[in-house]
Curated annotation (Swiss-Prot):
Protein name, UniProt field: Transmembrane ascorbate-dependent reductase CYB561
Ranges per topology, Vesicular: 39-52, 108-125, 181-199
Entry's localization field: Cytoplasmic vesicle, Secretory vesicle, Chromaffin granule membrane
Gene (UniProt): CYB561
GO BP, sorted A to Z: ascorbate homeostasis
């Protein structure tokens, strides 16, 4: 009789890519704060600086934390599946709450200043991304954390969940880039083309946002870096194939 399976070692390059992604993500958050502090006066809720809460919260929530939530199944390869599910879900909750604060901040700022809402491409994309993110979390909770969902439903929905998770993350980064460009054009106008220090800093920030998204998506698309099936998952997978003659669920 075989003993318990030993933990699968992490692929050699995976820890380095994960560490690089975290370095990029933290740099993006720090540089966003530096941009707002150096050129936009900082952040505050009860003042004209309330708008600055918006970009910082969106970068922390819908870019950095969402990206980290997607990496949970690559980083925690040998922990119990339930534990990784809960961590994956909690990171999305934190991302949602922080993004919600950012969304409230921009609407409150517009209301106080008498500005129009939801007229730009950035705002349309932002509302779409926020709605998709919330819907994805609700459906994911219903299928993978709520005990009532059947194994067959989970296995059939999982590919869609994985795809839309990556797609929403990519759309979040694209929306952040749109917002960054919009903020620069509003503030700098024609001076943007004269290599103003703020414009250069923001351009570097945009490149780092794109780099963070690229590294995260690369980690997610490497099939050999997926979380290996644990013993109980393999047993459920075999039972499901026997009963339904369908495909066994792949790990995220």
């Amino acid at each position: 009789m075989e003993g318990p399976a030993s933990p699968a070692p992490a692929p050699g390059a995976l820890p380095y890519y994960v560490a690089f992604s975290q370095l990029l993500g933290l740099t993006v958050v720090a540089m966003t704060g530096a941009w707002l502090g150096m050129y936009r006066g900082g952040i505050a809720w009860e003042s004209a600086l309330q708008f600055n809460v918006h970009p910082l919260c969106m970068v922390i929530g819908l870019v950095f934390l969402q990206g980290d939530a997607l990496l949970v199944y690559r980083v925690f390869r040998n922990e119990a599946k339930r534990t990784t599910k809960v961590l994956h879900g909690l990171l999305h909750v934190f991302a949602f709450v922080i993004a919600l604060v950012g969304l409230v901040a921009v609407f409150e700022h517009h209301r106080k200043k008498g500005y129009a809402d939801l007229y730009s491409l950035h705002s349309w994309c932002g509302i779409l991304v926020f709605a998709l993110f919330f819907a994805q979390w609700l459906v994911g909770f219903s299928f993978f954390l709520f005990p009532g969902a059947s194994f067959s439903l989970r296995s059939r929905y999982r590919p869609q969940h994985v795809f839309f998770g990556a797609a929403i993350f990519l759309l979040s980064v694209a929306t952040a880039l749109l917002g960054l460009k919009e903020a620069l054009l509003f503030e700098l106008g024609t001076k943007y083309s004269t290599f103003e220090p703020e414009g250069v800093l923001a351009n570097v920030l945009g490149l780092l946002l794109a780099a963070f998204a690229t590294v995260v998506l690369y980690i997610l698309t490497r099939a050999d870096w997926k979380r290996p099936l644990q013993a109980e998952e393999q047993a459920l997978s075999m039972d499901f194939k026997t009963l339904t003659e369908g495909d066994s669920p792949s790990s995220q």
